[in-house]
Amino acid sequence: MKLIGITGMPGSGKSAIINLAKENNIPVVSMGDIVRHETLKQGLILNPENVGKTAIFLRKLHGKEAIVVPCLKYIFEKYKNEKFVVIEGIRSIYEVNYLKKHVFLEIIAIHSSPKTRFERLSARNREDDSNSLDTFIERDNRELDFSIGSVISLADYVVVNEEEYDKFLENLNSLLKKIIMNVDE
């Protein structure tokens, strides 16, 4: 099995590659879903503050691999016969190291400027997003505290999402095919 890890700051455009993976019948597992699930289990509403606090709590309680361990277990149980699985939401170098100990992993980082990301997050209106600049900056700092910057800098591929959306999708689709086929187009 080969894992295709997706990383990037909130609002960078990670959902585009998730949608492409699904269109290509590649299973997708989101690490954020585990955190959101745990937030709800604690009886909290989904908002940036509660989701962030839950992520920090889980890491304090179970260590720096707190999110990735149940994720990989889930992948092995549910998708053991798949050649490829996309895992979205890798945020720390500890998660990368854990995954690489257990499975072949290639990482795609999606990058967008803070200005672009803030505009997207303000517009998409997901429960754990905010249109407050202060909350946006807080969230970015929390992500950076998890060491997402290290994951992005060590990614096997970096795709910049500042251009026209169709061109971005075209670039992502080509990259996904390259990884799956293991050939250059």
UniProtKB/Swiss-Prot annotation:
Signal peptide bounds: none
Stretches of the chain forming a coiled coil according to its record: none
Binding site for ATP: 8-15
Keyword field: ATP-binding, Nucleotide-binding
Record-annotated membrane-spanning stretches: none
Cited HAMAP family: UPF0200
Family the entry assigns: Belongs to the UPF0200 family.
Name recorded for this polypeptide: UPF0200 protein Mevan_0592
Organism encoding this protein: Methanococcus vannielii (strain ATCC 35089 / DSM 1224 / JCM 13029 / OCM 148 / SB)
The organism's taxonomic lineage, starting at the top: Archaea, Methanobacteriati, Methanobacteriota, Methanomada group, Methanococci
